[in-house]
Amino acid sequence: MFIGGLHMIHKKIGAFIFQDVQNPNETKTTAVTLRLYALILSVYFLVLFCVCCFLRDVPSSLLTLICGILYVFAFRITYLNHTHFASIFSQLLTLLWITVFIQRFGWDCGVQHFLFVLLVLNFAVSFHRIRTKIFVGICTCAYRLLLYSYTRYHLPVIQLSTDANICIQTIDTLFIFAELITVMIIFTQNSQQMEHKLIRYNLELEHIASTDPLTGLFNRWQMYKRLETCISRYTQHKLQTLTVAMGDIDF
C-alpha cells in the first residue's frame, strides 16, 4: 500500500511537471525543459542555503535563499503561458547570480561552469537562427574569460577554506551534470523518437514491398534479389551447396 501511494504521488508529480502549455504559439518541450532547469536550480540553492547556514554566513544564506525563490517563480510562470518570458528570465537570472557568486566567493567556487549549462539551455529552448546561436556562444565564452580576468585582479569578498571549496565544488559538479543530462534528454527525446518511428516505418514499407500480400512469401522481385545474393556467395565459395525449389500456387 505504501509503495502504491508513492507510485501515485510520482505519477502526479510527473503529470504536473510534464503538463502541456495552453498557448498554441508555445511548445511543451520548451516549457518542460525550463521547468526542470528551474526545479533543479531551486534544489541546488536549497542545498547551498544549508551549507551557508552551517558556515554561519548570513549574507550568503540570504543570497542563496533569494535565488532559490526566484527560480521557484521562474518555474511557476511556465504554467501561465509565459514560456518566452520564463526563458529570458531564467537565463538572465543565471548570468546575474554567477557574476555575484564569482565576485563574492572567487573563481575556485566553480559556479562559472554553469555557463556551459546556460549555453546548452539557450540552444535547446531558443528558436533563433544558427548565426544568432553562434553569436550567443561566442558571447558566453567571452563572458567566462572576462570573469576569469576579473578574479585575477580582484580578491573575493569571502575567502573560503579548502574544505568549503571542496564541498561547494562537489555540489556544483553534481548539479551541473544533473542539469546537462536533463536538458539534453528532454531536447533530444522527441527527435530520437521520431527517427525511431521513421526507421520502423521504412522497415515496414520495405517488408510490404518485398512480400506477396496473399501468401506473405517473398515476391518475384525479392526472390530474384535473394537468388542473386546466393549465387554470388556460391561463386565466391562462401556457400557450398545451393538448392532451388520452384513451385506455383496458381492451379
State what each model feature region is.
Residues 2-26:
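Short, Lys/Arg-rich, polar N-terminal cytosolic tail immediately upstream
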Residues 31-107, 115-122, 138:
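Hydrophobic transmembrane alpha-helices and their membrane-interface boundaries in multi-pass
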Residues 30, 46-69, 81-84, 109, ...:
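Alpha-helical transmembrane segments and their interfaces in multipass membrane proteins
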Residues 206-225, 234, 247-250:
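Conserved nucleotide-binding and Mg2+-coordinating catalytic segments in signaling enzymes
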Residues 123-127:
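Interfacial segments of multi-pass membrane proteins
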Residues 243:
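Cell-envelope/extracellular polymer assembly enzymes that use nucleotide-activated donors
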